[in-house]
């Protein structure tokens, strides 16, 4: 999506505050296109069956195998999730936030080593999974932790078209076919076909995806309060700091506990430097990730549409207890850094 369109959307969301989902012409075109992708996969399978019926095993069998291997996927659950019995406080918080948003509890919470968090719905039953990046989680205060979980779970109710079953099918199918075709010397000439379809689909969805991100921010603010959501967005500015710490940890004999080191640097960051980081972010016209508006735009929209009384009135969020429950995951991340660093040194 162009910077001009992104800026127009930002001004509309900031000034009008229209956070209700709506079906646009681009969304309808995307839905029709997704149906075409599914129909094309079914036709390919039918063509393979026809070839087999006529006795052409050489071409028929590969066509059917390809149609089966690259059929529409519904996503996969994370390989490892935190057991509820081991992290009851974290799950209780996630369940409370989900209830405030009007959705069911998550099926599981997975931990990553990234400065990020995400939400996924997988399988025919669309089971919900929450992914929490330990580096980001490690620098949050109690209200910011609530805002983070609320924002991610809000992706289940914010009307994002890319999370609908048919759209997910089409995106995964086109991506799989592109990867499969581009790897062969002969088939590579056909790779631009599914790749072009993927680019077109992403272009059709970009506007509503960014609008859905604003809606997720707004829904999260209704749960945790605008102040908490703004503070959380401010913490996202430390992604570059984390990247530098991680690179140093993997190549130098520094602190392998990248979460603690990030927390220390964030806490000791001078106000002047933090303001410089904010100013750089505000000057950015757009981001490479077309599904997310610039952080500065998200902050401005929330400031223009404040929620003074959050829906979730928790007596207290025992963040220390949650972090104690996450201690084994932190230890595993530290060991992963040490293992990678030793491998680099040996090489």
Could you describe each region identified by the protein language model?
Residues 1-37, 41, 186-200, 209, ...:
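Cytosolic-facing loops and C-terminal tails of multi-pass membrane proteins
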Residues 118, 175-180, 240-246:
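Secretory-pathway/luminal and periplasmic proteins that interact with or process carbohydrate-rich
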Residues 158-192, 230-237:
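Post-HEXXH active-site segment of zinc metalloproteases
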Residues 40-64, 184-190:
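Hydrophobic alpha-helical transmembrane segments
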Residues 67-169:
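Peri-catalytic and regulatory segments of divalent metal-dependent proteins
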Residues 15-19, 55-64, 68-76:
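Fold-level signature of zinc-dependent metallopeptidase catalytic domains
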Residues 6-30, 136-139, 144-168, 213, ...:
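Membrane-interface, cytosolic juxtamembrane amphipathic helix immediately N-terminal to a transmembrane helix
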């Amino acid at each position: 999506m162009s910077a001009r369109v992104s800026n127009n959307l930002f001004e509309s969301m900031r000034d009008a505050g229209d956070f209700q989902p709506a079906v646009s012409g681009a969304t309808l075109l995307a839905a029709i296109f997704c149906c075409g992708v599914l129909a094309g996969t079914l036709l390919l399978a039918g063509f393979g069956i026809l070839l087999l019926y006529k006795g052409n095993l050489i071409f028929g069998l590969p066509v059917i195998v390809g149609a089966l291997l690259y059929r529409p996927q519904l996503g996969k659950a994370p390989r490892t999730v935190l057991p509820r019995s081991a992290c009851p406080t974290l799950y209780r918080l996630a369940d409370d936030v989900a209830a405030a948003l009007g959705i069911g509890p998550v099926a599981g919470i997975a931990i990553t080593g990234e400065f990020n968090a995400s939400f996924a719905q997988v399988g025919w039953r669309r089971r919900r999974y929450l992914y929490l990046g330990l580096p980001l989680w490690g620098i949050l205060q109690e209200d910011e932790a609530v805002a983070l979980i609320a924002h991610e779970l809000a992706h289940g109710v914010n009307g994002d078209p890319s999370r609908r079953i048919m759209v997910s099918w089409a995106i995964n199918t086109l991506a799989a076919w592109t990867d499969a075709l581009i790897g062969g010397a002969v088939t590579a000439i056909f790779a631009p076909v599914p790749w072009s379809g993927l680019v077109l689909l992403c272009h059709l969805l970009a506007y509503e995806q960014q609008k859905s991100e604003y809606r997720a921010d707004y829904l999260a603010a209704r749960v945790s309060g605008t102040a908490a959501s703004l503070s959380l967005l401010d913490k996202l500015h430390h992604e570059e700091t984390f990247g530098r710490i991680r690179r140093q940890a993997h190549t130098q004999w520094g602190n392998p506990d990248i979460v603690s080191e990030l927390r220390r640097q964030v806490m000791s960051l001078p106000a002047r430097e933090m303001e410089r980081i904010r100013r750089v972010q505000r000057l950015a016209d757009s981001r490479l990730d077309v599904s997310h508006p610039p952080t500065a735009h998200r902050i401005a929209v929330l400031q223009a549409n404040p929620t003074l009384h959050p829906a979730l009135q928790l007596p207290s969020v025992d963040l220390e207890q949650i972090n104690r429950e996450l201690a084994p995951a932190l230890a595993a991340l530290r060991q992963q850094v040490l293992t990678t660093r030793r491998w680099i040194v040996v090489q």
